[in-house]
From Swiss-Prot:
Tissue specificity field: Expressed in the brain and the retina. Expressed strongly in rod and cone cells (at protein level).
Post-translational modification: Phosphorylated. Disumoylated at Lys-20. Sumoylation modulates the transcriptional activity of NRL on RHO and NR2E3 promoters, and is required for normal rod differentiation.
Lineage: Eukaryota, Metazoa, Chordata, Craniata, Vertebrata
GO CC terms in record: chromatin; cytoplasm; cytosol; nucleoplasm; nucleus
Family: Belongs to the bZIP family.
Oligomer status and interactors: Interacts with FIZ1; this interaction represses transactivation. Interacts (via the leucine-zipper domain) with CRX.
Species this chain originates from: Homo sapiens (Human)
Region (Minimal transactivation domain (MTD)): 30-93
UniProt protein name: Neural retina-specific leucine zipper protein
GO function term, MF aspect, one: DNA-binding transcription factor activity, RNA polymerase II-specific
Basic motif: annotated span: 159-185
Cleaved signal peptide residues: none
One GO BP: visual perception
UniProt keyword list: Activator, Cytoplasm, Developmental protein, Disease variant, DNA-binding, Isopeptide bond, Nucleus, Retinitis pigmentosa, Sensory transduction, Transcription, Transcription regulation, Ubl conjugation, Vision
Length: 237
């Protein structure tokens, strides 16, 4: 069953500059020409033979002479796959097996994401959100936060620091509002207490004013009646 070519390999081949290489022309049949050098005498003797896309199992088999352009495609694909294998820590044998199968190169990780993919970025955001919650960021000191951020990306570190600063400012503003509200309630309670005291004092002043008027009226009657007139015992009632 024929396997489709790897999109990653084809993209690399499309970006590969072939103009700097000379295409080897094969002599046509029946035309005399210089003998063609075998692959054993070329610099590519260490490269395994090029497999066909329709027969991936023929990598190690001996094949006939191929056109130069197909060899360049094969070398570009092999170099790209082997370079990806070395970057991922794969051995040359594993890279060759991946090349034979024409499958995507796996990436080490808990979910097998590709580097820089949206899935990997989303998983990293989730892990950091679980590790650095809002409460943890607020209670954490700057030194502790810098120590915890070692190994994180620069963008993630800046985002978490900005998040902590925002939470700190928000908490400070909320604390100020709560303090002002508490002071306002205290002042309103004090105002109500003083108003009640003022009303009580006004009532007391009114009572004293009535008593003053009563005593003044009695004094006026005593003054108008003159000395020795009548029995003054009624003044003490």
């Amino acid at each position: 069953m024929a396997l489709p070519p790897s999109p990653l390999a084809m993209e690399y081949v499309n970006d590969f500059d072939l103009m700097k290489f000379e295409v080897k022309r094969e002599p046509s049949e029946g035309r005399p020409g210089p003998p063609t050098a075998s692959l054993g005498s070329t610099p590519y003797s260490s490269v395994p033979p090029s497999p066909t896309f329709s027969e991936p199992g023929m990598v190690g088999a001996t094949e006939g002479t191929r056109p130069g352009l197909e060899e360049l495609y094969w070398l570009a694909t092999l170099q790209q796959q082997l370079g990806a294998g070395e970057a991922l820590g794969l051995s040359p044998e594993e890279a060759m097996e991946l090349l034979q199968g024409q499958g995507p190169v796996p990436v080490d990780g808990p979910h097998g994401y590709y580097p820089g993919s949206p899935e990997e970025t989303g998983a990293q955001h989730v892990q950091l959100a679980e590790r650095f919650s809002d409460a943890a960021l607020v209670s954490m000191s700057v030194r502790e936060l810098n120590r915890q951020l070692r190994g994180c990306g620069r963008d993630e570190a800046l985002r978490l620091k900005q998040r902590r600063r925002t939470l700190k400012n928000r908490g400070y503003a909320q604390a100020c509002r709560s303090k002002r509200l508490q002071q306002r309630r205290g002042l309103e309670a004090e105002r109500a207490r003083l108003a009640a005291q003022l009303d009580a004092l006004r009532a007391e002043v009114a009572r004293l004013a009535r008593e003053r008027d009563l005593y003044k009226a009695r004094c006026d009657r005593l003054t108008s009646s003159g000395p020795g007139s009548g029995d003054p015992s009624h003044l003490f009632l």
